[in-house]
């Protein structure tokens, strides 16, 4: 059986993971709501990231900065002047496209990052690139399209009240660098981690939850002395790989690390590597790590006139810290996890099943408890309530036992415990493994130890 992104999306919708945003009003393009099971996966993923990169790493601490910041922040960072995409319109069907993406889809070997708008325009004309929607070649001139959502704060709507929804969480960390460093008495090197919503008015978002206008980021800004002999870029790249393979069980065959060429680097970056995942629509950026030099602290120090340097005790020298930034989108990481987990299996006797082979620590429910007969409902429910004290458990007594197994397979529950009549005699239950469908009997008194051994 061959899986497709369309079938996976349909499955996730039907099972309560992801819903179309504003669906009863016809929806809103690229807006998604996370249902009861989707928000469980999302919250667990964020907790795993936070525990690994912030709580359990002695170098790092956390922050939760505002979504709406003083507009001077975005002036200093370069977002107001330079955070835009090349927009091109089809005169025939009125559809809008990112000019660079049209070229990259026409020829993936072209590095559009180093091309001016005029060069993009010339390439489209010379190569007879057509509109993806109507297949006509009749475009407007390319113009800059600002990616930040602009609004006004307060009762007056004039230039003095303009504010923006943040397009990244990083700047909230940079402007709080001195506050955090002073209040927590931190010495270099140290990192500040943050999870939060960001907003980008993308021209052509798409591919389900891969690229949306509203999304969550998990970012770490790691500050260090530029004369530090440690290779912090290498260290954090290794930590990302440990997280991907050991914490959320991503298959190494499904991702690759690509170092950006010099002409691909952002204006602030000395070095950047992308961890790319083999999504159903091809390879795409999953996680980025950049050496941002001292760019961010320098521009904020220059515009704010605040001293953002750190004093080195050994020689009383003031320095501006350099920054390594590992940054990942929550939804994009979820898409990779869902795509790897979504499995269609052909079983014996022309039977089949859809199973979400989610990592145990990300499954919405760790265990399901089900009675074999209505006569056993009370006993099974008592066991459920006992397990609920220590585990994410669900109780299911609807339909026959086969349908209950399929339901739990479909939402990724690692174990199903069946309470049957024999349980009344030997105090043993049947436990079924999601991935192998193997079953075994185990004493109720040993259940918690067994489950703890599986999840820890």
UniProtKB/Swiss-Prot annotation:
Residues binding substrate, per UniProt: 98, 168, 215-219, 325-329
A Gene Ontology BP annotation from the UniProt entry: glycyl-tRNA aminoacylation
Residues that bind ATP: 200-202, 210-215, 285-286, 329-332
Segments crossing the lipid bilayer: none
UniProt xrefs under Pfam families: HGTP_anticodon, tRNA-synt_2b
UniProt keyword Cytoplasm, yes or no: yes
Catalytic EC class: ligase
Source taxon at top rank: Bacteria
EC number: 6.1.1.14
Alphabetical keyword list: Aminoacyl-tRNA synthetase, ATP-binding, Cytoplasm, Ligase, Nucleotide-binding, Protein biosynthesis
Protein's cellular compartments: Cytoplasm
GO molecular function: ATP binding; glycine-tRNA ligase activity; protein dimerization activity
Record's catalysed reaction(s): tRNA(Gly) + glycine + ATP = glycyl-tRNA(Gly) + AMP + diphosphate
The keyword Disulfide bond is assigned to this record: no
A Gene Ontology term for the protein's cellular component: cytoplasm
Family of this protein: Belongs to the class-II aminoacyl-tRNA synthetase family.
Role: Catalyzes the attachment of glycine to tRNA(Gly).
Subunit-level organization: Homodimer.
PANTHER family linked: DNA POLYMERASE SUBUNIT GAMMA-2, MITOCHONDRIAL, GLYCYL-TRNA SYNTHETASE/DNA POLYMERASE SUBUNIT GAMMA-2
Protein name, as recorded: Glycine--tRNA ligase
